[in-house]
Structures are given as C-alpha cells and as structure tokens.
Amino acid sequence: MPRLLLLFALLTPICGLALYLAPYARSQDVPFKLYSLFATTFDRKPTHSPDVGSLFEAGAREFKRKIVAVGDLHGDMHNAQTVLEMAGVVNSGGHWTGEVDLFVQTGDIIDRGDDTIKLYHWMDQLREEAQAAGGMVLSHLGNHEWMNVIGMSSLYVFPSEIKTFGSIAKRQKMLSSGPIGKSWAANYTVTSRVPLHRALGPPNTDYDPALAHSPLSHAALSFVHGGLAPSYPDLTPFPSRINALGHSLLHKLQARDPPPPHPPHPYPGLPEDATPSEHRLYATDGPLWYRGWAVDPEAEVCAKVDEVLGKTGTRRMIMGHTPDFERIVSRCGGKIIIIDTGICHAYGGVLSALSIDYTLTPTSERGWREREVVTAVYKHRREILADDVREFQGDISMN
C-alpha cells in the first residue's frame, strides 16, 4: 500500500503537466521549457510529428519581414501620402503605422512640384517614427537631388516651388547647409543592400563573397535610383564603396559656394577636386543615371543581371528613374524591378508602391522554407510580380 501511494504521488504532477500542455499540442506557442521538462520526464521522443518552429528548437519560429518601396515623388505631397497610405506605411494622418518593417524611397523627391520642403520634412518625421516603433526608413539620393546640389537646373524647378523657399538663394542654402542638405548628408545614401533576414545583419551590411555558398548569402535586395550597371567599376564592396563615394562627393559639393542657376548660366560641373571615381559615380553608367536595365532588350539584360546580383550579394535589384506611367516593370523573372510610375501630378502616372513579403519557416531541425512574394500595389488593385519558394538545409540563427 505505501508503494502504491508513492507511485500515485509521483504520477500526479506529471499527469497534471500533461493536461496543462494538451491545449498547446498543435500550437507554435508551446512553452519550450515546459515541453523540455515533459519530454525529459518520459525519456522518449513524441510519437506524433510536432509543430516545427517551437518544439525542436527554442526560438526557431517563423520569421517574417515586410518591405515597401516607392519611386520618384517629385514634389507631390498629396500623391506621396496617398501611395504610402494604400501600401500600409502610414495612416490617414500621415503617421507610421508599424505594419511594415522597412520603407525604402529611391530618390527624386525634389523638382517638378511645389512640396519639396514638406516631403523632406515628412521623410525625416517618418524616419523618427519608424525607429521608435522598431522599423526603418531608407532614403536615397536621385539624379535630381544631385543636379540641384551641383547647381540648380531651372529646367525642372517651378517658379511656384522657389516661392516656397523664399528665393533661389534661400533654396540653394537649404540644400547645402540648411535642414534639407544636412538630412541628405546624414540620412541619404546612393544605394542600399537590404537583407531579407536579420541573420545577414542590418541594412547596408556589406556582402561578403566568402559566404557565397551559405544558404542565405544572397537573401537581400539592392535599391538605387538609376541602376547598377555591369560596366560600373565600383560595385564592390557593396554597398559601402558606392556610398563612400557618394558621401565624399556630396561633402565637396555642399562645401562650395552655390553657383547661379543653369541655364542661363553655364553648367558648373563637379568640383575641381572631384576624383575620377567620383566623376564615374555621376557618369551615364553610374548608379544615378544608368537606364540600361529599363530600356535595353530583354534578352540582353537577362544575360547580364546574374553577374551583378552575384557581385552585390542580392536576388533582385530595384530602382526608379525611368518611368513607366502605367505599371511597375518586372523583368527577368523579377530580378529587375523598376518602380518609377510617374506618381507626381506633373507626370500624371499611376499611383504605385512595391511590397515585398518575406517568410522563413522551419520545416525540420535543419530544414527551412523561404517564400518571397513581390507585389505591385496600385490604388484599386494588386498584381503579384513574383512568388518564389525555396527549400534548403542549414543552421540559421532566428534571433
């Protein structure tokens, strides 16, 4: 009898623990420590197939990341806010929703519209709101930002926009030593490498070719205004080499006295102390002006794209600059995506944003399934441009 009482005393807490865990038997929310205790007590593996992502490894749960990108805005605050709201980046009041992890803008906020000051101020506001919510805003300098810091081109600047600054001189000062110019120097880059998974590090972590054969080595996207040309000599290390050149050239341009508007005055050009690499940055095959991915024949670009993706450690390159007024353009199976659709009222193109939804799901102790859904978001419809699934084996940190 005493032995029976002892056996009953030992089994009671174990059975109670089993009853506690029963509701979680097929849920990813099983408390891992309790599950481990339960399994150890019985000293055997479960006879059923558990939900992966919570049972076989602490923290090995499904990982998700949502990225939204928008192209050229050209001085149109109303259309910009409409686009960001329909993509879930901001609410009706223009504030960060927290529904996306990263928002990327590929440059050309300035010119062709009157809302330059409002737009740059709004981008800085969203940058702060995103950071406070655990998100991020990545901003890029387009060729129009560079044209203005080199010397204002009166071909693209409306007189009504100049009035919002007060005068041409005040506008030039705002873009050099004023709040907009300071934000360019602090918060804007020429290009970005955005990882789809945090195991690759934060945005703009350089691609390491030594890791080329690891499962997630190229699980990243490149963003730039114009394009990353195959002939461009400063692609690597990516993206730090290009961004260092951009930072150096911007500093030199902002430090010189602003030249008078061109035309009617002569084109001022780059500073005398600009290096050959800085000149190449601003050349036709540089990342600010290159249009080949958008305009060259399909067979030609598809034959070259993998070389650039390999060097930059990315799966897709996303850019603005070359507008298609009806749609976001996807080429070579979604490896090339051009997101400038002429959003501003000066162009009258379609309102659009690009959404990238990435999911990494554990399928076994070392097995994983990636899914990347790339969607063109329009005002009244959505179009899936790519829906890629990939399975692999490997040790991936989910923390």
Language-model segment annotations:
Residues 1-399:
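Feature recognizes metal-dependent phosphohydrolase scaffolds
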